[in-house]
Swiss-Prot record:
Disulfide bonds: none
InterPro entries membership: AsaB-like
Enzyme Commission number(s): 1.-.-.-
Taxonomic source organism: Penicillium rubens (strain ATCC 28089 / DSM 1075 / NRRL 1951 / Wisconsin 54-1255)
Domain of life: Eukaryota
Knockout consequences: Impairs the production of N-pyruvoylanthranilamide ans downstream compounds and accumulates 2-(2-aminopropanamido)benzoic acid and 2-(2-((4-amino-1-carboxy-4-oxobutyl)amino)propanamido)benzoic acid.
Pathway: Pigment biosynthesis
PANTHER family hit by this protein: BLL6449 PROTEIN, OXIDOREDUCTASE AN1597
Function noted in UniProt: Oxidoreductase; part of the gene cluster that mediates the biosynthesis of the yellow pigment chrysogine. the NRPS chyA mediates the condensation of anthranilic acid and alanine into the intermediate 2-(2-aminopropanamido)benzoic acid. The remainder of the pathway is highly branched yielding at least 13 chrysogine-related compounds. The malonyl transferase chyE converts 2-(2-aminopropanamido)benzoic acid and 2-(2-aminopropanamido)benzamidine into 2-(2-(2-carboxyacetamido)propanamido)benzoic acid and 3-((1-((2-carbamoylphenyl)amino)-1-oxopropan-2-yl)amino)-3-oxopropanoic acid, respectively.
GO molecular function: oxidoreductase activity
Protein name according to UniProt: Oxidoreductase chyM
Family: Belongs to the asaB hydroxylase/desaturase family.
Keywords: Oxidoreductase
Keyword Oxidoreductase: yes
Length: 392
């Protein structure tokens, strides 16, 4: 394992007010308004920059922390390409997406990677005006709708009018159940790659196994071969040096069960997916067709993510926040949104004890944040996030 000396920083994070229940989302990918994130805390962070060149010897492990970081150069960084090349949809599809697929395969050892979406961000979050802030996010949702009907994977934010901004709200896009809904509902290319996973899980659900108990069958029991491995990742890269509002990642190893807040959310759905793969099975009535996912106009369906309450430990280190200081375009964050292999063995700790809960965890809570001492007059950070599904 690599040996590094952690450097501590502090930053401002926005959590749900403890005890508050988040409102249901009304648009795909739209988090609750900033007004619901009333618990604003200044918390310590560890700088991961010294780990970037350690490769597989990095102390930050996907299977433990839910994230890692790598130094990774893209062909789009060198001539004849320039900054605006990152807004060229053809170049992203022909050059960058294959680079991401290769990186994920190299880091995880998976056999297949399906790129499912890309998001470019280049706006400031207008915190002082909640209506304006919501509109900035809404522009992004409109862009999602527009792009989802065209080429796959959708690329959002490559037009100056899209107005996509960082999300200064502590969250994780998918719960384990949300991840399983995603591979069934989001797009036929993801679902096709996940067919063996879905069929294995559906056999268990039809036998009465509950959704939350699927984690116990990853390795299989008795004569069952178990559920094949799948994972969902976000590969996050700045497009210029980051001088404000960096992205932080919370460690799965220390984030307590009591601070995870399940939240109903909406996600685009593909109506062309075969019914036997897209259906949602009720283990208590497996022969009935369950369509209670809040299907609404615009081709969305209900899924589940996590928001969070702030830490209550005395030193306020329970959430184990990490980031890369002065992050450069070759400093890439690999964020695990879900991994069913990790979920099979990893449990969220119980707050204030050395014991583990029964909550299976498979992905890392994350958030944009205000770094203490950052230049508040600096230009908005610019980044590209590529989401992908991996299969073994």
């Amino acid at each position: 394992m690599g040996s590094i000396t952690p450097s501590l920083h502090r930053g401002k994070f926005r959590y749900l007010t403890r005890g508050a229940k988040p409102a249901q989302s009304k648009e795909a990918y739209l988090l609750p308004p900033l007004s619901e994130f009333g618990d604003v805390l200044a918390l310590p962070l560890v700088d991961m920059k010294p780990s970037l060149d350690l490769g597989d010897d990095s102390p930050y492990k996907l299977s433990v922390h839910g994230f890692t970081a790598r130094r990774h150069h893209s062909a789009l960084h060198a001539a004849p390409y320039e900054r605006r090349s990152w807004n060229d949809e053809h170049l992203l599809r022909e050059i960058y997406f294959p680079e991401v697929q290769e990186l994920v395969q190299k880091v995880t050892g998976c056999k297949k990677v399906v790129v499912s979406a890309a998001v470019l961000r280049n706006e400031l979050y207008t915190e002082g005006d909640p209506a304006s802030a919501t509109q900035t996010e809404q522009n992004g949702q409109d862009a999602v709708k527009k792009d989802m009907s065209e080429l796959f994977p959708p690329i959002v934010g490559n037009s100056p009018t899209d107005g996509i901004c960082p999300a200064p709200k502590v969250h994780l896009d998918l719960t384990p159940k949300g991840a399983r809904y995603h591979i069934r509902k989001y797009h036929r290319e993801v679902t096709s790659a996940a067919e063996q996973v879905i069929e294995a899980e559906n056999r268990l659900l039809e036998s009465g196994v509950q959704w939350d108990d699927l984690k116990d069958y990853y390795q299989g029991k008795e004569s069952d071969d178990g559920v094949p491995r799948f994972a969902l990742f976000s590969i996050w890269r700045p497009l210029k040096p980051v001088h404000r509002d960096p992205l932080a990642l919370a460690s799965c190893a220390s984030f307590p069960e009591s601070d995870y807040v399940p939240s109903e959310q909406l996600e685009p759905m593909d109506h062309q997916i075969s019914a036997h793969l897209s259906r949602i099975i009720d283990p208590n009535a497996p022969k009935l067709s369950v369509e209670n996912e809040r299907q609404v106009q615009g081709g969305t369906c209900q899924t589940y993510g996590y928001l969070a309450y702030g830490p209550r430990d005395k030193e306020q280190k329970a959430h184990g926040w990490h980031f890369v200081s002065e992050q450069q375009p070759s400093d890439v964050l690999i964020i695990q949104l879900f991994d069913n292999e990790m979920e099979a063995h990893a449990r969220a700790p119980q707050e204030g004890t050395n014991k583990m809960s029964n909550l299976g965890v498979g992905g890392a809570i994350h958030s944009a944040f205000e770094l203490e001492g950052q230049d508040i007059d600096a230009e908005a950070r610019e980044s590209i996030e590529v989401r992908c599904a991996a299969f073994w």
